[in-house]
Amino acid sequence: ILDGENCWEYYPHNGYHFLKQLYSRLVEHPKIQLTTFRDYLKYHNDSTRLPSLVAGSWVYGTFSTWIGDPAKNRAWDLLCKAKDDFDRVMASGRLAPEIAQRAEEQLAICEGSDWFWWFGDYNPAESVADFDQLYRAHLRNLYRFLDEPAPPELEHVISRGGGAQENDGVMRRGQG
């Protein structure tokens, strides 16, 4: 499994040529067989159930980077409402196929986890303001595709930030 975001900006063309060559060589290698989780499990039924699974991530081993802060929770509430509205409109069948496809793509943009990374008081205000405006703009775009009025809450700032400039970036300093 390759992490899809955190190192590629340091490669020319975001790692496109590197990854293309890497995957080509892996495919051609006589002793390596590429697969997906789904395909592997299809042919290997002997798996055992885990008795438990700990929630966590590579950031502090918790989900606190994405949820729990009041601003992050507000952003999730807005996304959940948008998803409910999306589901209702899609179930109605009233959108033309090409508009439905664009709405689905727009929803996928809104569902990206990076939005929630930026919300909260530990990131610098300038960065938070940019991501806040962009996130709300993407949600409004979704409502445009759905031909639904956007909730008035989308006109209000979700998060203001306020952290030190040194926190501006993909990694946060460890605690303790």
List each model region and its residues.
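Active-site and substrate-binding clefts of carbohydrate-active enzymes
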Residues: 1-176
